[in-house]
Amino acid sequence: MKKILIGLIIGLFLFSSVNASVNLTEVQNAISIQQGINWAEVHNNTWYYPPYLGEMFISEYYFELLVLNWTHKSAFNATYFTERLLQTQFEDGSWEQVREQNLETGQLDATVFNYWYLKSINNNPKIEAALQKARKWIVAQGGIEATQTMTKFKLAAFGQYSWEDLWYVPLFIFKQNGIFKYTYVKDIVAQWVYPHLTALAYLRYQRTVFNVPVADLRELWINYPKNGIKISPREYSTLNPDSDLLILMDEIFKLKQPLGSFGAYTISTLLTLMSFKDFQSKHPHLYQNEIQKAYEDGYYFVEFNYFNFREAYHGSLDDGRWWDTILISWAMLESGQDKERIFPIVQNMVKEGLQPKKGIGYGYDFEYAPDTDDTGLLLVVMSYYKEAFQKQIPETIEWLFSMQNDDGGYPAFDKGKNEDNLLFKFAFNMAGIANSAEIFDPSCPDITGHIMEGLGEFGYQANHPQIQNMIKYQRKTQNKWGSWQARWGVNYIMAVGAVVPGLARVNYDLNEQWVQNSINYLLNKQNKDGGFGECVLSYNDPEKWNGIGKSTVTQTSWGLLALLEVYNQNEQIKHAADRAAQYLLDQFKRDDNTFYDHSTIGTGHRGLLYLQYPSYAQSFPLVALNRYQKISQGQYHFSKNLYNGNGEPVQKQNI
């Protein structure tokens, strides 16, 4: 009994001491400074923080510049980039894809491409020393044979891998007529797959090898082919190209977007332009004007992204300005900034980005592919201007409801592109393409949570039939730990941070056990410093890594947003939320009064490829700290009109 009393006294002391240590003046100070930073970063009525994939894509770009004859006009500076690679190489010789503070070694494909670039321009002793270390590391990881299929496709285009050792992509999957409508791949794969697949299919069909000076990589093989790399380009008729090839070319041209991209991505655009280069060399009388225009526009698009004013040389994948603007507008509005001052920014975004009777695109050149996640949080922003957008709001809500999958959850771009096409799922796995990208666009809990949050701002509640289906989806997909695997952010921490606030906005009873399980998950995963963090390896080995990693400000904000919805349930939750808020303040000071993520927090392709989203650190901490401040001052609204999983009213207050 004596030990129990001592434990209770110590526990109460800890709770009270941490509560008292969160200085609300410091909270407001951090909020004000971040608001000022955000105002200083507005350009042309948008916030723009390009997401990036890492330097390996700039290494690739060096070779693509040679193919496209752009070296004389590109902003690429070989001296600068070479020094950058030498400085970022790990001691073991590897390079990371994007920054990950939880790992002390790199990624194989990134290391192969960076090695290849350095070997191709090798002009000083420092490079040779870096190559020796990298070569040893690559071979230890299994060599070129162990790289992803996408890497092998790119190596094959430069004679470093045999096309015949890669699976053939049949061209009939790009046909729509007759019986082929059942195998038309555009209607089956995710939006982000198709513009890459069309170009890869072309290069594989032609077995294209570009005749440009590149370094030989035979030393990176474990078992280099006895007869060398087989170079066997397909025979062709200049005047009479294959009809299937022309159908593929027509499909590719349909992907061209207003700013010059093919599909809105830098990588798909470069692969497409390289395909055009090959096609033009074989059939110079066809598509002359279209291809010339594609070169001109494509050059602008790629250079704009790869050497932009904010993330130059980081390998920016695309333009995501509407997503960035949504997030930061939301953060600024919620934290009390002047609505009228922000209105021109929101008005511009709605005018330029929101598609009529649909959703909003992720950024420039995504007009053809509205994004449900972005649209869900756009609703939150538009809720501050209901009168100004009284026409757009109901149309946007109607579109969102139309995009719900049969399982109750939400995809990113396309309804009905779950993994239930077993034939294509098997084919992509057999071809090895599934080891380079996510092929389908299934429902995901993070998007579904954001959409619930947006709909909740317009009075939709947990008794609405479609929202009941969303809740059933969340319950069904919850894992044994009480969390979910997130699709677009790392990872189980992010999912709880999206699901719980979404449930709260639609007045769902957060006392239900399955929701409590997700809160308990967070309590068990909080780091000693008060923050939350999670390594990207949680996708590859969830049993070991779920919810584990060094703290970041964005992941801490996600965790805090969930905890705040149940802040008054008990002292343990209060204590955890206080610690998370204190971590944000401490990290803000450590990073010279800025919010910055020291690890990758964005997901491109789970377990394969990751994206860093700089805008997350400019927005989520601001939302989380503002809500924390309001709760601490008794100003945060908790709903009393609650519903259970059957959509029935709950006769008790949530907290």
UniProtKB/Swiss-Prot annotation:
The keyword Amino-acid biosynthesis does not apply. 2,3-iminosqualene and N,N-dimethyldodecylamine~N-oxlde are effective inhibitors with IC(50) values of 50 and 30 nM, respectively. Expression of THC1 in Saccharomyces cerevisiae enables to eliminate anaerobic sterol requirements and provides valuable information for the design and construction of robust, sterol-independent yeast strains for application in anaerobic industrial processes. Residues 1-20 form the signal peptide. Keywords: Glycoprotein, Lipid biosynthesis, Lipid metabolism, Lyase, Membrane, Repeat, Signal, Steroid biosynthesis, Steroid metabolism, Sterol biosynthesis, Sterol metabolism. Gene3D superfamilies: 1.50.10.20. Transmembrane segments: none annotated. Optimum temperature is 30 degrees Celsius. Glycans are attached at N23, N44, N69, N77. The record marks W323, W488 as: Transition state stabilizer. Optimum pH is 7.0. PFTB repeats lie at residues 393-435, 515-562. Belongs to the terpene cyclase/mutase family. Squalene cyclase that catalyzes the oxygen-independent cyclization of squalene into tetrahymanol, a triterpenoid sterol with five cyclohexyl rings that is involved in membrane integrity, permeability and fluidity. This is Squalene-tetrahymanol cyclase THC1. It comes from Tetrahymena thermophila (strain SB210). The lineage of its organism: Eukaryota, Sar, Alveolata, Ciliophora, Intramacronucleata. The gene is THC1.
